[in-house]
Every structure is written in structure tokens, then in C-alpha cells.
Amino acid sequence: MKRKRLTELFPFLLPLRQKQRKFLFYLKMKFDKAIYSHTKEEGLLPHLIFETHSLLINPNTGYDIRYQYNKVHNLKLAVKTMDHILIRPGETFSFWQLARYADRKERYKDGLCLVHGEIQGVYGGGLCQLSNLLYWLFQHTPLTVVEHHNHAKHSFPVPESGVPSWVDATVSEGWLDLKVKNETNATFQLDFSFDEDNLYGCILADRPVPLLEDMPDGPDQK
């Protein structure tokens, strides 16, 4: 029989545990000697490396559709923190370094999230759609992935979009991050936009970047 977590036995301890994990999570980054990307530039860099899109509303989850609209709200808050961000030589992009205070002015809503193997509506749920898109963008650059995590299991069918369904990069504040380091001489930049149906993302650079010879084309390649 699988041993239960302490927070499963005593749910009232969960908020305290989450605060503890987040504190240690960011404390570790403060002293890890990485130079994290925080600079934005209003204008776009001249060289487009790759662009893609992700369908916002998934009607096939089997759960209340309101969670999909809540997810879109959450995505827009998180995207604001990293839109037009520069990833300069020697810098490391961290999803949570940027999105840490995304809900400071406007609160997240409950979105779907995989928790202990079960789909639940949780505060800020749905941000993995953004981390998936980011990971797919990064896969088309020479940026070095230094932290990446897959979901423990896939939860529901994913509709066709510009991001292949096998692309998987989960994030969870205090536990799991998505990080890439720029070990090149080029500066990269992220750009995002929304329309009614899609989240669009692209990555640009300040100079031409050679296309990667070995591109991932299936779930067994990272």
C-alpha cells in the first residue's frame, strides 16, 4: 500500500508546506550563481528563429469548461511577465523567476492541474500550456536546457496545434521549473500574443542563428 504524504493525512498543513517549499525554492536560486534573465526590450530583435501557436480552449477535458476560460486568464497574467524578455549571453531563463509575481496585481483563477495523479481545479492551474510552448520554442535554438520535467502522466486529450502533443514540460512553483541557459554569443528574445483562439509565441535573436541539424520529431527525442 502506497504511503500517504503528511499533507494528505493532515490537509491543514498544505499551505504551510507550500510556503516553505517556495521560500527554499527561491532561496536556492538566489545563491546558485546563475544570472537570471530579467531585462525586457520593447522593440523586437531582427531575426526570427521560430514561431508556433497553442489552442487556448480544449473542449475535450471532460471537466467544466469554465476551467478552460480560467486557464486563459492565468496564461495572460504569466505571459505578461516574460513577453519581450531578453536572454543575453551567459544568462539563464527561469519560468518561475519571471512568473513569480504574475498574480501580484490581479489574482489567478482556478484551472485544471494534475495533483497526486488526479485532475483538480487549483489556483493558477493551466500554466503548463505556456511551459510546453516555451519548451518547443527552445528546442529550435542552441539554448541549453538546464532544468526540464515531464508530467507524471498525460491527463486528457490535447487538441492539435502548433505545439506537438508529445511536447511536455511541466512547472510547479516551489517544485519544478523550466530553465535554459544561453551559452552562445547571441541574444535571444521571446514575444507572445493572443487572439480569440490561440496563444502565439516566437523566439528571435540579434543575429542569424544556424538551424539545428537534429530536431526532435517524436516523444523519444528531447
PLM region spans:
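Well-ordered beta-sheet/strand-loop patches within structured domains
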Residues: 2-222
